[in-house]
């Protein structure tokens, strides 16, 4: 299989995150473990090499249930202990099609939905942590999409008790189809002018508040500008996601008890109360 090199993916992803966050979010990989084997499914099943190749070739359907046994991985690699000792903050798992990993999942005391149901019985970690599921069949753009959904889940939780215009997250993700004339930055799936999921190459022009978010947050000045897909790469997944992540607020101060630097929540969910 002509799949991507894990180191190249990791370097590209980390570089994009540094750029998008204005240098605030910097990953450091402290250990890499290469596992020669297939992960266990939730019912204990393991693929063997021939069966898996048959699945890839379409000769046999993928095994069901597809979900991986996260607890087997957590126990095998002492994840809870490492998090509790502050030796690691999160875990990245690079795998192959049909491996059964979520794009992201959260564990630890007070863990909440992070594009997947929270991992129960992981309080021994003593703090929240995220496990990212990446695929070396895909590219950096898809890694950024996983990160984008993680950001969406965490910011949705962060602002859940605020309503109306006080819920700045809801304002951030507005796009033209749902809020005519009031498009902001959109979501990871919906650009300001998108008509449907993944519609990042839509050439139509719409009025957007994206510059107000990028340059003036939290002291909005009512700045708007006409934008279209040329702003975020004409449908290029990676370019759109960098553009979107770049617009996430990253300034000092607080409003309604919530930090104006959203990256600190996204990178470390222990900064928020659940």
Task: Report residues per predicted region.
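Propeptide-to-catalytic entry region of secreted or membrane-anchored zinc metalloproteases
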Residues: 1-83, 97, 102-103
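Loop/turn elements at helix/coil->beta-strand transitions in domains of secreted/extracellular proteins
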Residues: 22-26, 86-92, 127
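A short acidic (Asp/Glu
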Residues: 39-42, 102-108, 144, 152-154
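Auxiliary, metal-adjacent structural segments of Zn-dependent hydrolase domains
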Residues: 77-120
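Active-site-proximal beta-strand/loop segments in catalytic clefts of secreted hydrolases
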Residues: 94-98, 134-135, 153
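Flexible, surface-exposed loop/gating regions in the mature catalytic domains
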Residues: 115-136, 243
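Active-site recognition of the HExxH zinc-binding catalytic motif
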Residues: 137-158
